[in-house]
């Protein structure tokens, strides 16, 4: 007789195969249809707010794995805070100005030269908005909840108006000024760059040692030894710097005299082949001040000056000084009233001031200058070196120092307040505070102007003598016009139309044509919180570790300048995403992992589970092989949820629920284990330690549930009468644990937990996201757990012996086994406390157990004697005429 239909087999609509690529978008549509984001906000609206302010990604091309990694981390934080009862509005944002968009528009065939600035800007705007639409859909596909219908864009009229008002206040406080200084300049982008836009990469350069002929009688027939890796800056040389307190030597080699730093002489002797060097005199650097030398390429006399920036680490101790091409050179030159010579144009070509090198690209001039020095006898040594050199972070091409008129924000004015504000920020990692502190300490004034078109205009007027009108009232008026008409009017309207009606200042004005640094754009994004009535400062900024020099830095600067407070209360940062071998991803290496492909093939929840399984504070790795491992972990979760949902078929918690105290010992143990787990998981979430969350939950699901509790309880769940007390106690335990696990995992796998929650027949809300995060608790009965641990150790020994018996073909499956157990008094007492002495066969999934006390553990496995029950497959002493055991006979009677 077939008893299959009499068994209570699991039934659920939660499918074994996730098919997440198809199912997740359907789940997301459901979230939108019930307005889930606003529903949770409404539920928590009277509670304490938690604001994570979104750093704006750049609106260009599809999202990459770094975007997915970061946005998912933010979603973890927000979902946890939401389910903990906090009010968590989240406004996504986009950075929409800048050179990459200009380049993409130009690449598409748009001829910039045939268009007005306003026409070109309109095309850039259209492109940026399309990119926002693309990325918005991709971020939503990740399962990120937020106010996607009302994001902030740095091109929005209101955003720009608020940004200009920040600029206006900084002007009013004297923080903004225009100056001629050497700044990072990218010939490939034809624009000034801030320090945050520079990335250091290896570069091959010419390293040369040059002799400058001294003038005067004090050191006759003498060459000053200088070293440089930028020969193209020699046309701009206006001085040689020495350290006032260092010891220098005048020495002779083969009849020629030289001056160099005493400490570096041994290195120079070796490098330059000065095998007969003889020191003639020692003296302090200050001795050389105001002495003169002749330029090696031009008919020009220049002075020796003193500079504290001179070091004894490399070179010669005498520094070629070109105030137009270096920060240190600029400041030391200012002390000595040196000119600011910078004979290089915006494209990197030498100007007429460079004489014979005019028109050459600076790198070509490099080679020519070296040859000219060789020919005129001033080149003492040259070689090619590889060194770390600043590059344009967009074009990846070298940048140069070049002096041009630019707008600056004075960091010196703010530095004390910035450093003080950093102390008041909560740092998720202590090194984050150190890193930003050091960056602020070493930071020079911020060049905020860019010689581009697509960005926020710098709304400054000039009088007929080219003096800027630094008038807050004027700038605020322009801001109000931008808010209504947009910033293109700066290029479309004439000056008179841009001025206030009551303006009484000078006429015949012209407009500044430079735009603001995009870091000034994003660095004022906290204005969106004020504009939308949200708490300021934000509770958290969470971004990549590169933002210590970028967004964390620029946001702090503008907020301190205007509000006097940090825009963030806490900083959390993450590392970079590398391939499985720890290499940077690139198309050329073929190691790029596309998040869109992962989501379509494996699912957003699998990608999110990967994010939760790595230590985000450091650089992390991802590869197809690693994703397969994560998929396997996901499959275990899904199978476990499916089984638990299936065995809850027919269970109504309002009718069938058995309270904790009445459930029996092992059910209470499992519930207690879950409560302790929930406590630890909450603690980990509160510390944003997501990898610890997965490290805690996965072993519980795989070992405690799947491999033990859900395995041994199958007999009762399938074969006992539906209303059997023990069966209902097990179902009550499973119900508690399942509902708890789904809530604990919702921040990480929201699609899967939503789907599983929907499959629960009895629940309180439309979506699990409306549930509260379970808080867990301490062990209700510590002694219960202590005794369980003793049993668990015994069980592990038994499992090993069963496996050996299986390998020896004594048994096939564990139900074929009979166990003879000899245990010590402690183990026996533990089994008695757990009420397991007569239940070990069920718990160990064998057919019979004989237990005795002994001094030490002994386990014997033999084949069980008896009859196989045709319904439950246990081997029992007796079966009835229908081949079923006493228990199954009773259940079948009840079904009649």
UniProtKB/Swiss-Prot annotation:
GO terms for molecular function: aminoacyl-tRNA deacylase activity; ATP binding; isoleucine-tRNA ligase activity; tRNA binding; zinc ion binding. L-isoleucyl-5'-AMP binds at residue 543. It is found in: Cytoplasm. The keyword Heme does not apply. Binds 1 zinc ion per subunit. GO terms for biological process: isoleucyl-tRNA aminoacylation. It catalyses: tRNA(Ile) + L-isoleucine + ATP = L-isoleucyl-tRNA(Ile) + AMP + diphosphate. ATP binds at residue 587. Its cofactor is Zn(2+). Keywords: Aminoacyl-tRNA synthetase, ATP-binding, Cytoplasm, Ligase, Metal-binding, Nucleotide-binding, Protein biosynthesis, Zinc. A motif ('HIGH' region) lies at residues 57-67. The keyword ATP-binding applies. Pfam families: Anticodon_1 (PF08264), tRNA-synt_1 (PF00133). Gene3D superfamilies: 1.10.730.20, HUPs, Ile-tRNA synthetase CP2 domain-like. HAMAP family: Ile_tRNA_synth_type1. Monomer. Belongs to the class-I aminoacyl-tRNA synthetase family. IleS type 1 subfamily. This is Isoleucine--tRNA ligase. It comes from Acholeplasma laidlawii (strain PG-8A). The lineage of its organism: Bacteria, Bacillati, Mycoplasmatota, Mollicutes, Acholeplasmatales.
